[in-house]
Amino acid sequence: WKKSVLAAAFVALFSNVLLNLNFYPTIWMAYDTASSKSQFLTEQLLGMVANGILMFFILAASFITAESLTRRAFPKHIQIWKTWTSNVANSKRVLNDTIFAYLIVPIKLALIGAFYILMERNFGFWSPASSSFDPNYLASIFPWYTGLAISLQAGFWEEMLFRAVPIAAGVLIGQRYNMRFTGLMVAMVIQALIFGAGHANYPAQPSYARVVELFLPSIVVYGMIYLRLGVVFGAITHYVYDVVLFSLPIWYSSGYMFDKFMTVIGGLIPLLVILYFRMKHQKWSDVDSSSLNEGFVPTPPEEKTAEEPEVVSTVPSASNVLNPKIIGIALIFVIGIFSTFKLSNVEVPVNSPSIDKEKAISIANQFLSDNNITLPDGYNAYAFDDSSCLLYTSPSPRDVRSS
């Protein structure tokens, strides 16, 4: 479970905290000018951290459950966290399975394209083009990073949660009652429905369009890859597929050559890992049984010998009462509070009107009378402060209008 937790921490940091920081230029669109800049930034940063921590726990629970169930249900699969390790990543089996995962991507794109052409023309399905990609990705600090980060979490988390957990659980439940195949078929249908419903928040008509769209790929693409190869290779297909879609704003835009290059490099990471281990060992290796799920050996817990606790009497002193860590945290807290007040715009100049509403309306009516202007019946006078209008280039009396 420790490797699952480490993987969850990496994805939570890479695809949540750093991704939100990457959109730093756009967070100012939600800036409330009634609060200080430091307060706004503090709220945003705390929100990013809180979201990352929450996502970490969700990812960790999903990864631990998926790894455990897969290990029990499919003993011939390569252990999830050994796929990209020495003497496994540089094997021809991993290379062939990875290439196969890449080759599925254009097939999946063709299936989705054909689905919408058929359903929109013959069955009235509708999906707005604006939901395909978000042009705001180009406003981020590193546009290439956005697609990679989103695809990493979507690819690996969704395959763990929507594929590995239900299918492996269905197999184990069916196996418990000597109905392994029946349990597998039921789990296949259930995971396809859940996967489609989980993506039904995109605007589309009818409301179940995404469920219908993803039902078949969930079974014949991702489901079969998981059964035959393992969850890692299904995640690779899912990851590369999402990278292609999320990077569309970059490829449709002129320039952005560095971002296009980084997007290609990011999409090739699974192959680059294999190339790295192949160059490191200078040969292709074979996957032995110890790297398969059936060869998994749990790490035995360390036995701790009971030791008599030593009673140490400490006398309070400045060295142990004023702990340096406590002092450091307190200083950071004080500096942060001071900065909040220091950067806050406490004094805001306000130019209040020098006359009241009734006086303003009286002046307006007098102006109409002096200029022999008669308004049709039904017009009512009202007054408002329009001193901030950009039409005024020099100080002038309050603008009083009537309508």
What positions do the PLM features span?
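Alpha-helical transmembrane segments
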Residues: 1, 59-68, 270-283, 336-340
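Membrane-interfacial loop-to-transmembrane alpha-helix junctions, especially the N-terminal start
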Residues: 2-11, 183-185, 231-234, 289, ...
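Juxtamembrane helix-loop-helix connectors linking adjacent transmembrane helices
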Residues: 25-52, 56, 60-155
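Membrane-interfacial, low-structure loops and terminal tails that flank and connect transmembrane helices
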Residues: 73-96, 284-321
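Transmembrane helix-loop-helix hairpins at the membrane interface
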Residues: 127-285
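Internal/C-terminal transmembrane anchor helices
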Residues: 319-342
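Short, non-transmembrane alpha-helical segments in secretory-pathway proteins
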Residues: 352-394
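Single conserved hydrophobic/aromatic residue that forms the stacking wall/gate
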Residues: 392-402
